[in-house]
Swiss-Prot record:
Binds 1 zinc ion per subunit. This is Alanine--tRNA ligase. Consists of three domains; the N-terminal catalytic domain, the editing domain and the C-terminal C-Ala domain. The editing domain removes incorrectly charged amino acids, while the C-Ala domain, along with tRNA(Ala), serves as a bridge to cooperatively bring together the editing and aminoacylation centers thus stimulating deacylation of misacylated tRNAs. Its EC number is 6.1.1.7. The keyword Cytoplasm applies. InterPro entries: aa-tRNA-synth_II/BPL/LPL (IPR045864), Ala-tRNA-lgiase_IIc (IPR002318), Ala-tRNA-ligase_IIc_anticod-bd (IPR018162), Ala-tRNA-synth_IIc_core (IPR018165), Ala-tRNA-synth_IIc_N (IPR018164), Ala-tRNA_ligase (IPR050058), Ala_tRNA_ligase_euk/bac (IPR023033), DHHA1_dom (IPR003156). The keyword Signal does not apply. The gene is alaS. It comes from Leptothrix cholodnii (strain ATCC 51168 / LMG 8142 / SP-6). Belongs to the class-II aminoacyl-tRNA synthetase family. It comes from the Bacteria. GO terms for biological process: alanyl-tRNA aminoacylation; negative regulation of DNA-templated transcription. Its main location: cytoplasm. GO terms for cellular component: cytosol. SUPFAM superfamilies: Class II aaRS and biotin synthetases (SSF55681), Putative anticodon-binding domain of alanyl-tRNA synthetase (AlaRS) (SSF101353), ThrRS/AlaRS common domain (SSF55186), Translation proteins (SSF50447).
Amino acid sequence: MKASEIRSTFLKFFESKGHQIVGSSPVVPGDDPTLLFTNAGMNQFKDVFLGFDKRPYSRATTSQKCIRAGGKHNDLDNVGYTARHHTFFEMLGNFSFGDYFKHDAISYAWELLTEHFKLPKDKLWVTVYSEDDEAYEIWNKVVGVPAERIVRIGDNKGARYMSDNFWMMGDTGPCGPCTEIFFDHGEGIPGGPPGSPDEDGDRYIEIWNNVFMQFNRTEDGVMHKLPKPSVDTGMGLERITAVLQHVHSNYEIDLFVALLAAAKAAVESAGGKDVDPESPSLKVIADHIRACSFTIVDGVIPGNEGRGYVLRRIARRAIRHGYKLGARTPFFHKIVAELVAQMGEAYPELRAAQARVTEVLKQEEERFFQTIQHGMEILEHALAGGTKQVDGETAFKLHDTYGFPVDLTADVCRERGVTVDQAGFDAAMEHQRSQARAAGKFKMAAGLAYSGAPTAFHGYEHLVCETSKVVAIYVDGTPVDAAQAGDDAAIVLDHTPFYAESGGQAGDSGELRNGSTRVVVADTFKIQADVFGHHGRIVEGSVKVGDSFVAKVDAELRAKTVRNHSATHLMHKALREVLGAHVQQKGSLVNAERTRFDFAHNAPVSDAQIRQVEAIVNAEILANAAASAQVMALDDAQKSGAMMLFGEKYGETVRVLSIGSSKELCGGTHVKATGDIGLFKVVAESGVAAGIRRIEAITGDNALAYLQSLESTVNGVASALKSAVPEVPARISGLQDQVRALEKELAALKGKLASSQGDSLLAQTVDINGLKVLAVVLEGADAATLRTTMDQLKNKLKTAAIVLAAVDGGKVQLAAGVTADSTAKVKAGELVNFVAQQVGGKGGGKPDMAMAGGTDPSKLAAALASVPGWVGERV
């Protein structure tokens, strides 16, 4: 059966069971701001399950377009290198909204798989939640699946109800157990049954998940039975197609065979020569054309933010892989026609948008091909020196100047065994963003043409102005005489208590009221040095130039902000005391949540130094010293010893704030006395650039809540360790000693196990012209065990070429050894690389001993089987 026939069979089967066939929702969720992209069949029915929406049917079936390439669900890095990862996939599903439940859901699934898809019953395994006896009984007694092929899965993710077989929509809300159906590919494929230590192999593949929503979880963690339980199922079309077409990779199904052929032709038409049809890069391109095309169909275009940036990342990743294969002109857009041929019938919107999709992708390619060659040259230069990590500045330059998303750079580096300095990249990105934010504020303010009188600021003394007259209104940057309910506007008042953002302190929020008119002010900024814009939404009534309002600052948020601002001054002084007079402020952000303070210092601030700073600041708070502000001439301020920011421009008169032992020039709002701060706590310390450190701190009730949370965590740890809080460090130290002892014991046991295996493996040697050849897997071995066992086997076999392998966590470890008398003909380094290349890796070493790694355990058996032939060609 073709993929299109499988999709049709699924939908028609459930239609025959009374289900409404519902079209796929867009990959861009229209009514769920919590989702970047649609990533499951149930997304469009979320409000139905939650009881917020009703449909004219209680049974539904869909084939849903899904994307997993951003946010929590992100498969992008794995695509092209595994058999089943995709950025775009189709999720087949059937749903019951308070209609049928477990019996019918399980029976329908079994009937479709065994009677319509003709899957052998003895090839199907199922899992159930360990406490779901009802599902177990249905599978065993009603359907007839033998007990040995039904696996109970418990809470295997570290907490109650945290299980592969228990589904939750969130921390609260509908949830319930699920049952999963697996297909056994047979003994020739490595891997164990679900629930076993080897379950991550490719032998047993999950093809269908049935979720039974029968509980509502409340905030206290209690499970309450739902009055009308529901069913949500999902089966990946690509996976079931691979099973029905008797192939082990999704990229071998008919749909992808066609797309891979089109991708190969497109790349070769753009300069690629004799492209390997098995190349992972072709798989990347074939996968990404689906994600890009359907995202564009649903209204997204490549950009630098949100979904547009995810689309750009996917498209440019595909283009880079084409470039790797030799393409030097646009090629990616040429594959759209084949995609439409394959999927246009099922998704008419794709066929209708073919020309637009092609043009959007072509334009994106043309844009990237202008810079990709130069960018790759820069990246190649960075990689040429044998570095193990590309620095963040280079990665950011590639991103900012040459359009390389950082994960594209990381993709190239990963192929060379090199990493990217993500922290350095993030710091460079944040620096640019902060500059952009500042520029944005300036542009917004500069774009508002204002020539009236300055704003009189009363916010140092008052939080309310009873009569504030509107002197200007701006909507979308345009001056207007009036604004209506629903408008977002910037309003200039003649008098205001609102502090406008400056000096690192966030602008005030609050409200303007006048009879039936109410404006919620979200932010206050400076249009000019002495003209304040109040940015907010008119929620009731209307506003006209000349109207008078009561202007009221949000007192709670102002109080939190001034606590943080005053604490920043005390912290600055304390840092100079503890670290030295070289400490100078380099930037700050003060709002109601916290203070963030950047300063010059060339080393991390130690925990002990942070404790000193906290002690100094909290001592100032306990002293409850009054704060005072004076306006004076700049010369007088300098003579008074007030601290000034180097490079800052000041007017002839300045405002000097004295608080505790601190004296600084500052135009911000502050507490009346240090005691008003309440409590001061540093919560983070980090480096943001060379010679620049950053401290984040909180005050008042935020600091108290933070400490209470820490106390709760420590008490929880103590409870888990069954010890008193003061004894926790010693208890943890004791457990660490135990772990080290157990690890040592485990290593010894592994050595004994390997030794015993080594004796039994001698019988598997093959004699080739007098050279004994052995290529086997050592169960439970690690790299050290492979080396030890290799030495033992070489001593016993005398004249031999040996390859030992171990699989752990989806990775392959290899060791090759050749006895000294045979290295002239067979070299261990060449031998281990021959095997490693077959399992997606590489390695090296000496002629008599070499190590390697690989990423594809599924090909290990074949790789080991090829060793005797390779050796035979050399002896």
